[in-house]
């Protein structure tokens, strides 16, 4: 079997070598001293053959929200989340980024562009939360503090190296539910963050 494999590999190598050598279809002679050769090549339409995998959270859970007794101070509920560049191949890190954007599922440019969780049994009960691309929300601004200017969402992070991880925070101010009849707003809430990734120049 080893001998057969060796012969097969040798023949395959010979065929590959032959396919890469130019074919002599014309000759120059003392009576015909000029000739032409067509030079051919192919450029792939794939943009640099870049491939990547950005891993986003499946679920982010605030857990149990508690109605505060007063709203004289903030009552934040924070939960961390991660977005990771699991794989990056072929990216020119000196000139290119993989940019990740995020928006609420119902957000629109020029319209309502904040992030919300909504009561699963009552679509009229929605409460806003904030998205940070840092683990220090007290010393930075939420990405949704400004208006959303692109349909793909707010710019969240730029990746150029495989393995890079962005850890951020979702923040819910429990003052949002202060003053409500708790029996009227009780229940399960959910919302969806829509992520978008694209290769862009730095």
Predicted regions and their residues:
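Extracellular adhesion/glycan-binding regions together with long Ser/Thr-
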Residues: 137-165
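A surface/secretory-pathway sequence property marking extracellular, secreted
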Residues: 108-146
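Intrinsic disorder/low-complexity segments enriched in polar/small residues
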Residues: 3-6, 83, 97, 151
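Generic hydrophobic, helix-prone segments enriched in Leu/Val/Ile
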Residues: 102, 127-129, 152
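N-terminal small/polar-rich segments of proteins
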Residues: 24-124, 160-202
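Sec-dependent N-terminal signal peptides of Gram-positive bacterial secreted proteins and lipoproteins
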Residues: 1-25
């Amino acid at each position: 079997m080893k001998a057969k494999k060796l012969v097969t590999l040798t023949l395959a190598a010979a065929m590959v070598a032959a396919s890469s050598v130019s074919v002599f279809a014309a000759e120059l002679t003392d009576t015909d001293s000029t000739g032409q050769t067509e030079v051919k090549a192919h450029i792939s339409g794939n943009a640099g053959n870049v491939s990547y995998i950005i891993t986003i959270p499946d679920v982010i859970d605030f857990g149990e929200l508690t109605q505060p007794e007063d709203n004289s101070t903030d009552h934040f509920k924070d939960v961390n989340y991660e977005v990771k560049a699991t794989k990056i191949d072929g990216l020119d890190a000196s000139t290119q980024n993989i940019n990740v954007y995020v928006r609420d599922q119902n957000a629109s440019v020029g319209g309502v562009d904040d992030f919300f969780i909504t009561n699963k049994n009552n679509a009229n009960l929605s409460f806003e939360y904030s998205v940070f691309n840092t683990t220090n929300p007290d010393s930075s601004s939420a990405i949704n503090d400004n208006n959303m200017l692109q349909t793909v969402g707010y710019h969240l992070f730029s990746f150029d190296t495989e393995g890079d991880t962005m850890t951020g925070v979702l923040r819910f101010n429990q003052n949002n539910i202060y003053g409500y009849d708790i029996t009227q707003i009780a229940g399960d809430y959910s919302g969806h963050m829509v992520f978008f990734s694209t290769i862009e120049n730095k």
